[in-house]
């Protein structure tokens, strides 16, 4: 969600509260000195992260020298490691980099250092931060791409009292919406990445996380029957023009974030659809640009705020549903995150990684908005509204967590995007598209 600047008194109260909690170093364990820390965050996110680190600095006496490296932090960090000048600690945005650094012996084994704190995370998150059975990282920030956003007023117009919990219910609700004169979906396409995110959710929910990871590694081919199932399942929704605002042809030019505006327009305009899919960052588009939407009252899966047309309009989301036959995959989540690793093992680095593994810093950023933590010890009360709370609870409760395939597929991600746009143009041409994708995966991944 959109980072929000809170009054100084509120931020001060948060910092004072955090200073007294358990994972901030006490005066008797002050380390002093300094620790260098790299991450990708800048601007508002950097300000929020700095606020989150403030209790650590005040309690430990250690100065954190933070440096923003932007979205190319992986490249910058690799060069620094190769040149023998890495930072003490870094937050990196994918598990692949952690695996590479651990294999090279460039980051510290945290298994014993975090022996009392690793239980703050579910097994799915600890597995993603491990290499050869040893823990090498701490997931400080998560992102949830398991979210379908809906306009409660449009659901109410079709007498739909609660969002769907299964894929079958989603298809049924689409029919119910159409019968009431409401178009079900605004399908974001842009240059292809939102369609890829959508398809990957369908694959995860139908095939499961193990198969998903095998497809990512290309140990499962793109011609596998599980891929076909995902395509045919997705076609149940996007293969019918009347399900989409603008139809299939119009959806091909549905750029982000304009696709969100079709469900959550500015005051004075009417919605063109009831639902839109994309990650948790959609909330920024719903509440920004002088819009006046308020978060729903119960977060994921529940009833929403009032649908009285004279009242303030609201928004909500539900978790991307699995088919009822694949209900075991319901809590599997596709997304992203930032994992902290130690490149120089010093007392200051160890103190900082312990702090990042605890709930205090994450709770501060959570209260500021635009943040979700997979840490089980971050209290639900830290989140400013029911929607952000629901997003975070889904991360914490994930049975498995996978990263977007197009973030892990080497140089052929843009080919993948185009392939999925080609599928949208002709949903019956699955076998040809699968064969093309498998050839591209072989060329892009080298196997």
Question: Residue ranges of each PLM-predicted region?
Answer:
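Extracytoplasmic/periplasmic substrate-recognition and gating elements
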Residues: 281, 290-371
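Extracytoplasmic ligand-binding clamshell segments of periplasmic binding protein
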Residues: 209-292
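Hinge/lid segment of periplasmic solute-binding proteins
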Residues: 93-146, 171, 317
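Extracytoplasmic/periplasmic solute-binding protein
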Residues: 136-140, 146, 171-220, 229, ...
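Short, solvent-exposed loop/beta-turn-alpha elements that line the ligand-binding surface or hinge
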Residues: 111-123, 206-230, 301-310, 322-331, ...
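Conserved C-terminal helix/tail region of periplasmic/extracytoplasmic solute-binding proteins
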Residues: 156, 393-447
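Conserved N-terminal structural module of periplasmic/extracytoplasmic solute-binding proteins
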Residues: 4-8, 12, 19-99, 364, ...
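Long, aromatic- and glycine/proline-rich binding clefts that accommodate carbohydrate-like moieties
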Residues: 318, 366-418
